[in-house]
Amino acid sequence: MIKVEELFIAPTATVLETLRKLDETGQRILFIAPEGHLKAVITDGDIRKFFLRGGTPDQTVDHAANYHPLSVSVSERGKARSILQEHCIDALPVLNKRGVITDIIFAHGLDVDNRKRVDIPVVMMAGGLGTRLYPYTKILPKPLIPVGEQPIAELIMDRFRDFGCHDFTMIVNYKKGMIKSYFNELEKNYTVDFADEEVFMGTGGGLCLLKGKVKAPFFFTNCDTLLDVDFGDIYEYHKSHGNLVTMICAFKHYTVPYGVVELGENGSIAAMREKPELDFLTNTGVYVVEPRVVEEMRDGEKIGFPDVIERYRRAGEKVGVYPISESSWMDMGQLEELEKMRRKLENQQ
């Protein structure tokens, strides 16, 4: 059980340090509480809004924090459930008479479901060869590679189903007969349709197979990416920003394990940096897409979906980013990452 003090963060900590601590604790909230006195809270959502306002990772977290947090007194603990539900928050601090945090009540601990429901279609890219997962994919198509007791594609669908999605379409090609057989025989509370790709068309090209069939905005996902996010909030963000496409991106922090040398003129050294640290956003391979994109796909064009987005961006269309924390993204596109995903899911059980 996590200790209250483990969720405290200093107001002078950087936003990057705060993100790391959120990842380390596995929580979505931290508290600015000098000597235990509650001053502010900081959530992954607060940080997301901060970045979208132009904030940077090296700024102190007090620039992103919420200094009007909700709380309950020790005698008001019984009101926690209704407050968590009414305000759709993940946690509520309990304060004594001196304003010191004595406990934290989590929504999941009270079995409070604050997820926003979103009933829109989900399209899954499931036709690739999965060459990075060879030799597994010599026997099984990537969507059917097991992670624990379920294939990865089924795990992904279950995550979307938890938020109200029940209409799935898989764009299939490689070993498509195995994929169809599995999902047709699976006992499930959602529908799965298939679009047959006769030649490999890239992660974007297969969308042309859905012309005339997609009438509403939809989630578009790889078959090897598992996100621990609020899909309802993502969809609301997409609508409120008026995006044609919203790309879900994860914050990544990477330390180069070597000294980096910048080359100057005539073989001279212009600069040296020992094990530099890099911070960037990376594409998770999950998107919210307007149906217009499908109708405007060129028949037979072989293209990756990031290139489709870039084409719209250059044309002046509104394409956006929904940032999430690194720990919210699990990718099994490579063997090493597949094993990491398995271990992480085992720890969550």
Where are the model-predicted features located?
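Bateman/CBS regulatory modules and CBS-like beta-alpha motifs in cytosolic regions of diverse proteins
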Residues: 1-21, 25, 31-34, 38-39, ...
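A short, polar/charged loop-to-alpha-helix boundary motif
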Residues: 46-62, 108-120, 281
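Catalytic-core segments of class I nucleotidyltransferases/pyrophosphorylases
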Residues: 218-219, 226, 232-239, 252-255, ...
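A short, conserved acidic/glycine-rich loop-to-beta-strand motif
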Residues: 241-251
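Conserved N-terminal catalytic core of the sugar/cofactor nucleotidyltransferase
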Residues: 52, 70, 118, 150-223, ...
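Short acidic/polar active-site loop segments enriched in Thr and Asp
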Residues: 28, 90, 166, 216, ...
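N-terminal nucleotide-binding beta1-loop-alpha1 segment
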Residues: 106-139, 145
